């Protein structure tokens, strides 16, 4: 899995509170392997300016995330340009991510904060053969190659023309990944880093309510090898772990037998049939 974050720097108004938070983070099994540093530890390395000298080395992609309850004006200048998480219900800073306690902080959460700040594609899941990650504009050539192998498939809508697809992708990254924290992700074969498809979670209005829908496609040369099932099982685990929803839907053409077979294998059951030639399936997440 993606391992950008290596260190959490904790800065709190109250030193005792800061120490307790650091100790709690160190005891959380899901954060094992990460360095947890508070102001006192850094200052003990030398004179008072040691802390700021250390922070000046916090360069982009250095692997640090700041957890703080300080206002922006109270932060040392050099930590205003690293990924930050606000702490406490009364936090008044500008961090886009805020937690009331440390229970929700795990490595995936830290990676999300880090990647959003530096506009990096977030890795969602890793299986024996695959990596699922968010796409970026530089992936478009690979995506066009995948869709070109499916040009004769009646169930797949083609991509837009290049300029329009680039703009669509920019907005998708900003609004789906950035706001909803899910979307369609790239399916990448680990052995050669080849993009072989897409799979992920989209939004769909069903019976007047916004629901989560599983979607997937694998390029023709890589079909029949179990890649779709492997990717979808990883997504179901991700949805369960992140508690994204209690039910997940899936929509496919009623004549798309391989897709129907996969849906049933994944535990989906019929929710509605023959809606303009499409079947709707549902799966309980528990």
Predicted regions, residues:
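Asp-based, Mg2+/Mn2+-dependent phosphohydrolase catalytic module
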Residues: 1-125
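Conserved SAM-binding loop
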Residues: 66-68, 132, 252
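Conserved beta-strand-loop-alpha-helix junction that forms the acyl-donor binding cleft
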Residues: 249-260
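Glycine-rich acyl-CoA binding loop
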Residues: 224-229
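GNAT-family acyltransferases
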Residues: 1-11, 24-32, 100-221, 234-238, ...
């Amino acid at each position: 899995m993606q391992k950008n974050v290596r260190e959490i720097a904790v800065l709190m108004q109250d030193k005792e509170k800061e120490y307790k938070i650091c100790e709690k983070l160190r005891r959380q099994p899901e954060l094992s392997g990460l360095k947890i540093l508070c102001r006192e530890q850094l200052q003990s390395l030398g004179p008072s300016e040691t802390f700021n000298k250390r922070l000046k080395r916090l360069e982009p992609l250095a692997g640090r995330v700041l957890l703080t309850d300080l206002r922006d004006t109270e932060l040392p200048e050099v930590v205003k340009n690293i990924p930050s998480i606000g702490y406490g219900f009364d936090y008044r800073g500008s961090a886009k991510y805020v937690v009331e306690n440390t229970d929700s902080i795990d490595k995936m959460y830290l990676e999300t904060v880090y990647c959003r700040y530096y506009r990096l594609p977030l890795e969602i899941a890793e299986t024996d053969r695959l990596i699922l990650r968010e796409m970026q504009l530089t992936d478009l050539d690979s995506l066009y190659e995948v869709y070109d192998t499916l040009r004769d498939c009646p169930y797949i809508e083609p991509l837009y023309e290049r300029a329009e697809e680039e703009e669509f992708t920019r907005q998708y990254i900003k609004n789906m990944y950035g706001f909803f924290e899910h979307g369609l992700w790239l399916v990448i074969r680990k052995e050669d880093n080849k993009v072989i498809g897409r799979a992920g979670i989209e939004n769909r209005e069903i019976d007047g309510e916004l629901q989560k829908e599983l979607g997937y496609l694998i390029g023709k040369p890589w079909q029949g090898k179990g890649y779709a099932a492997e990717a979808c099982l990883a997504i179901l685990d991700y949805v369960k772990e992140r508690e994204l929803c209690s039910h997940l839907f899936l929509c496919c053409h009623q004549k798309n037998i391989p897709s129907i077979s996969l849906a049933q294998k994944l535990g989906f059951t019929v929710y509605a049939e023959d809606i303009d030639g499409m079947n709707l399936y549902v799966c309980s997440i528990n």
